[in-house]
Structure formats: C-alpha cells, structure tokens
C-alpha cells in the first residue's frame, strides 16, 4: 500500500469519524436543549447594554434572566436605565416598580496640578491603581484624585474626560450613575450624588485642617463654619471633613449660606436639577 493510498485512507477515516461525532452532537443538542424564555431577550433589548454591573449581576443578560425568572429580583435595579427602563421592565415582568432616584458621579476633589502639592514625580504606568501602590501615589494629599484617568477609561458611557489640569470632568448629560468609575477609583474620590442637591463638598481629605491646607489650597479644613451657618442641619463634620446630607439639602435648602462661609472654597454649587418625568 503506497503512502498516497495510506494518506487517502486516513483522510476518509477522519472524515467519517468527524461526521459521526457531528451527528451525535446535533442529536444531543436537539434532545437535551433547554428552552430560554423569550421574555429574557425582550427585557435584555431594552437595557442600556453598558454591562456596568451596577445592578449587581454580571452584565445585562444576567440581570434580564434573573429579573424574568426570579420573583425576588426587583425591576428597578438597572441604574443607567433609570425610571423609564424600570417602568418597562416592571410592565414586562408583572412586577411593581419602585421609584428610582436619579444620581450622577461627582469627583470629590478640586486639587488639580496648580493647587495640590506633589510628593514626588511618578514615571510608572499611567493608571491610578498602579500609582497608588507606590507610597499611595505622587500626590501629597493621600485622599485626593491621582489624575491618571482610570475612571475615564472604565466609563462605559463615555461620560468622562481628563482635563489639562489633571482632574476628570463628568458630562452630567451622559452620566447614568452606574457607579463603574466609583468602583475602580483606589482613593474613593468619586461619589454618586442625587440630582437636585444644592451643594457638594469638593474634597475627600481626612487630614486635620493645618495639614490639609498645607497639601492643597482648596481642601476642606474641617473648620465647621459651614455647619454653623447651615440653618437646616444638612452638614456635619466627620473625620475633619464636611459631609452634606443630600436628603435634607434637597428638600429644605433654598439659599446655600454655607457656600459664602467656606474659607477655602471646598464647598461648591452643584450640577443641575432633577429632570421632569414625562
């Protein structure tokens, strides 16, 4: 038997074996196939497809499957979709949709390149997580934004850009409040705040006043003037940092007296009002 004949025989045998396995797999696929509820795909189609995981599930498909199959999974967990998506999911699944409070990301740091002290010059990987592993990062303030844009790179909705001053800028019209940027920030500088809040503290420092002021010219120094001048009790001092109670600030405040009293300008007016529901 020549080499050519042997080669042909091998090809024929392998083809027959492959064909046999193909038939077996096709039969098994048809015999043991699990039917997927078509409603799952319908729900998935109305989700924003950001795959942000803010709902607590591993992507939009996973949430769609869970909300359709599991009666305990709420229809309003899609943060980017907000109230309109929650309403549609509720109608499709026959569940009650609770109100969704619209939120957007807010960077609690104003310490840009001109205002914050640098401890050293960083020449490593341009990533906030990587930079934070080296003595906490090059910024003197160990609580401030490092400015390498890890949040920008991870925003699934292109709602963030890096400014020339070394701080991220958030496009409030594009931001869905999914929290992806917050989850990747090693300094926990980004916070999700409700729309409609009147003021926000543009600082994340927990350092004492003298230290904070030395490291950044616009840091909160925990002096308490904002607290004393807030007539609604919406501000408190925690770990040398002013903290605003958003619920009180939204419902009670009509004039932000705390803004004028802040000696460093760490308290800032906020973004925009809550959009009217259709």
Language-model regions: role of each:
Residues 2-229, 249, 256-261, 265-278:
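Ferredoxin-type iron-sulfur electron-transfer modules and their immediate structural context
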Residues 225, 235-243:
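Strongly charged, low-complexity linkers/loops
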Residues 207-208, 241, 245:
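Cys/His-clustered metal-coordination modules, chiefly Zn-binding fingers
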């Amino acid at each position: 038997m020549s080499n050519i004949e042997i080669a042909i025989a091998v090809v024929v045998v392998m083809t027959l074996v492959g064909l046999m396995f193909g038939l077996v797999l096709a039969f098994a696929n048809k015999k043991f196939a699990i039917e997927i509820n078509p409603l799952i795909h319908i729900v998935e189609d109305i989700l924003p497809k950001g795959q942000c995981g803010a709902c607590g599930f591993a992507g939009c498909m996973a949430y769609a499957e869970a909300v359709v199959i599991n009666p305990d999974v709420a229809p309003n967990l899609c943060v980017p979709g907000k109230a309109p998506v929650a309403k549609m999911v509720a109608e499709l699944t026959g569940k009650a949709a609770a109100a969704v409070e619209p939120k957007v990301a807010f960077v609690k740091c104003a310490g840009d390149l001109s205002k914050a002290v640098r401890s050293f010059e960083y020449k490593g990987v341009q990533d906030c997580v990587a930079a934070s592993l080296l003595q906490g990062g090059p910024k003197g303030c160990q609580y401030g934004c490092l400015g390498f844009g890890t949040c920008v790179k991870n925003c699934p909705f292109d709602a963030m850009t890096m400014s020339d001053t070394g701080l991220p800028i958030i496009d409030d019209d594009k931001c869905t409040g999914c929290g992806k940027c917050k989850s990747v920030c090693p300094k926990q500088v980004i916070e999700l705040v409700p729309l409609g809040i009147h003021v926000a503290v543009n600082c994340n420092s927990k350092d004492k006043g003298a230290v904070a002021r030395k490291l950044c010219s616009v840091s909160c120094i925990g002096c308490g003037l904002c607290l004393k001048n807030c007539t609604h009790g919406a501000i408190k001092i925690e770990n040398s940092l002013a903290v605003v109670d958003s619920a009180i600030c939204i419902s009670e405040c009509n004039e932000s007296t705390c803004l004028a009293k802040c000696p460093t300008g760490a308290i800032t007016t906020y973004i925009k009002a809550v959009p009217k529901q259709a």
